[in-house]
Amino acid sequence: MTIIGIDTVAVVVSNRRKALQWFTDVLGLPVAYIGPAEPNSNPSVQGSHENPGHWIELGSGRPMTRIHLCELEGHRVEPGPTGITFLTDNILAEYERLKLKGVRFKNLPKEMEWGEWLCEFLDPDGNEFDLKQPHQP
């Protein structure tokens, strides 16, 4: 038996409806699953963009790593690094696209000494993400 990958990572948000809209409309991530609006409901009955349930999964690709937008009742969102890195094949174009949509960046895309390009951006709750263009030989 071995670990074969990462299935889901969680991002704590202050409002899952607003976060769902931002992650889909601004970042362009596809919805993988929206859970039922009521806790302990039949999991086959999905929620909607207007009335999302506690469990929201975003993501695509093979293998797919999903992002769970998690609104914790009674907990304050603590802004800071998430450790989550989004990949792109053209960081300069993606930086410009996201900037036009109002995304706040901590820095400009920069080529690192090992050949990858990186920059950091924030969601509306102050969660920090990396944007990376892999080294292209």
Name the predicted role of every residue range.
Residues 15-16, 89-92:
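Helix N-cap motif at beta-to-alpha junctions
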Residues 52, 80, 115:
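Exposed loop/turn and edge beta-strand positions of beta-sandwich/beta-sheet ligand-binding modules
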Residues 4, 10-64:
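Core segments of cupin and vicinal oxygen chelate
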Residues 55-57, 66, 85, 118-120:
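Short hydrophobic/aromatic beta-strand element in the GNAT-like acyltransferase core
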Residues 6-8, 80-84:
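Eukaryotic phosphotyrosine signaling hubs
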Residues 22, 92-97:
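Short amphipathic alpha-helices within nucleic acid-binding modules
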Residues 1-2, 8-11, 95-137:
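Vicinal oxygen chelate
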Residues 33-35, 61-62, 70-74, 107, ...:
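Acetyl-CoA-dependent GNAT
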